[in-house]
Amino acid sequence: MRLKFVFSRCENVQISRDDNVSAIKNSHVVILGVDPSQVEATLSDIAIVEALRGKLLISIVAGWTRGAIERLIDAEWEVWEGIRDQDTRGAWVLRTLPNVAALVSQSLTAIEDHPSPTFPPQFKDIATAIFTQIGKPMSIPPALMPATTAVSGSTPAFWAIIVDSLIDAAVAVGLPRKVAQEQIYQSMRGSAEMLQSGIQPGELRDMGTSPEGCTIAGVMVLEEGGVRGVLGKALRESVTVARAMGKVGGKVGEKGGEEVHVNDTRKI
């Protein structure tokens, strides 16, 4: 109902509920945006499979590889391996991954490079145009998608925890919470823009530190507390779980699964 309200004034937008087959039949491009646990049930509907035939299916579902989705769409996936033409395949599946910053049109959206030489190039252009509307799209090789799932998809939550801890500390030393929030948010935004301008992280750190100063004192506490190791391990753990999620469509190393990595935090 919320989407219906948002788009109620858009003449060229139609809201369809409880009739996915009809919506797919009347569309050229379909975005698969269900919960990961609902992918199999959604794509097990033969009517949906038939409606998808020959169309571009853009997946934004974390953990589901392109191969796993394609096998769900049609049990004859192994036959399609050598055919790859739009008339005989179930759908052209393009794996993507936006993040929560799409809410403010600042998403970093990973668009997986499709391995098929016959993948219609206009489909990649369509996906890029779509995700440009909500932030910055980036082409990513298939082997890097598990890492990107965490680096792009998980880090907003990490930033939120870091920012929340800094705000609480600012309140503890006397700042009103709203003032602390405004200062920390702007500091984070300014730092991000400086880094995006080409300034290196170490360079930015050195800009704010002076001998016996307050900033270097705080930096030393972070270093002594092992902040680099903790953040690094948190990110590697997220990537490890992302690889495990990729096993949905097959065992590790098989089509649809994700390759293990030497720096994974554990074996799953």
Q: What annotation goes with each model-predicted range?
A:
Residues D18-I111:
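Rossmann-like NAD(P)(H) cofactor-binding subdomain of soluble oxidoreductases
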